[in-house]
Amino acid sequence: MGLYKLYRSIYIDSDEESLSAIKDFEMLEGYDPYTRDRIEEIIELNRIIELDDDDVIYDQIYFPYNPLHQVIEARRANLVEIILDQGKYTVNSVNDDFIFYPLHVLTCVPETSDVLTYLNEIEEFTLVKDLELRACKMNLSKSISIAIIKQVLKGIREFTDNDLRKLDNQIREDELKIAQLLISRGAKLDIKNEYGYTPLRNTVINGNFALTKLLLDNGADASIKCNGMTIFEISTLSQNVDMIKEIIKRCGYNHDSKILCRVASKGYINVIHFLLDIGFNVNSFDSFGETPLHAATRSGSVETVNALISYGSTVDIKDNIGSTPLMHACGNKDISKLLIEKGADPNISNIHGYTPLHNAAAYGSVDVVNLLLSYGVSIDAKDKIIGSTPLDHGVHHPEIVKLLLEKGANPNTINLYGYTPLKNAILKSRLSAEYIIPYVVLQDFSILDGRNMPGSGINMELIRNDKLLQNIKTSCEIELKRMKEIRISNRYSLDIFITTSNIKFLSRLVTNDKFSSINISSFPIYKSLLQNAINSAIELRKCLDVALYTINSRLENTLWDMLPIEIKNQIVLLLDNTDLSIISNSIQHSQN
């Protein structure tokens, strides 16, 4: 009987079968439950086991190789009592390597993936995690994961909400029974494991209200700090407001500025509401100058961010380096959008000159980059460290490079080290470098003195020294030459649509009948730029035509009628997007 077979038996088999498995295991020659001999099997996995929450990942391998610890982990209350009655183990039998006592095992919740790995059932991970998520949304205990695993291993794959509630009630009953048994036989309540954690700390952070009350009622010392945190601070990480209230009733609470920040970073919105309602400062800050709003942006929870703002959190408050919550949120579009809608400045920079766009580009967040650009942020803003632009920061994300260039980013900027975005891209992402070449060539083609620009010169030298990049450059030049040869008016060729950003000007050219005969797909390198420019020009042309029609209708039989159509068109071109929107809305209003 190997160690893993025993572990599996305890999770799957009947009491009688598991007891037989334990007996067979203990009969192995040289077995000593208080040595590490058997753990050699476990070390081969070389895994890190997370026992309870995201804040605490044990940096060594833990496995309940003591049979008493195994039956406690599996919450086998009957087996715990039988094994203790046999006298081979005591309520204070300890795993010497981790100083894990039975109460530590009971008050921790093992990581699902590790349990399934030991059971050789990792293929059930998705099913079990989905069920755990359902249980979490139902506010059931974390320990239900153990009950779920045992049921799934028995072949049960469908669970109603009522089934999950029954499992939760049973696991809670088993835990209380085991705890009462251990305590009644003299288990040490305040013993610390290798990391300084007590059983009380574990029950509190895991939100196990019943076990917490039991330990406190039996004299567990609530004044012991773990990692410098009071039991109240630990309770705020449990997500269980009833737990927090119980701790406050018994032990009081402190107003450490880090508490609300820590909770906000987890997105525990119910705890946030409770803490703010009892007087915590929504604009408190930690040693880094971060407020709860800064921390909440990392939680991924829009609801948490919105709640803090509703309590009066300052949206553009700065931390010690001048970064605002928006700068921390640049990997999440929904949170970034909410902050801007609530008044956050998308163009703000910190003491290093980083803007939200720098951060969004570095994160590789296409959605946030698009969002920020829609608010007119400076696309070529340089930081104060080495003069890098958002394009420089995004070179390791090809999709970001492509987007920024399409939106007008300058590929010929130079930082303080003499690096251009192309040089950075060659070092970090070959695909990004290939995306940059067409824009370097286009800028060189568009600006008469482009060859005298320092950045252009550096980029052209880089291209000359790379055969593949040189081939891309040649293909770009061929396309541009062909566009130059396609006349769309007496003065302009097709290339004007990618060499100017003046959409109003292009809207005057796009009405030319020659466009219907142009095959945009024959320009694969610049197709996207061409198509976007043409579409934007067509859309604006439609808006201008509607505006002109509306003005003609409203000013009929006035001096306006005497103006030549050319003058009218020039006047309409002076209207900005706001004016055009007002006119469009007035039409819709009159139609309604």
Curated annotation (Swiss-Prot):
One of the Pfam families matching this protein, by short name: Ank_2
Family matches, as InterPro entries: Ankyrin_rpt (IPR002110), Ankyrin_rpt-contain_sf (IPR036770), PRANC_domain (IPR018272)
Cleaved signal peptide residues: none
Record has Repeat as a keyword: yes
UniProt entry keywords in alphabetical sequence: ANK repeat, Repeat
The ANK repeat ranges on this chain: 63-93, 162-191, 195-224, 227-255, 256-284, 288-317, 321-348, 352-381, 386-413, 417-449
PANTHER family the record matches: ANKYRIN REPEAT DOMAIN-CONTAINING PROTEIN 39-RELATED
The protein's name: Putative ankyrin repeat protein FPV246
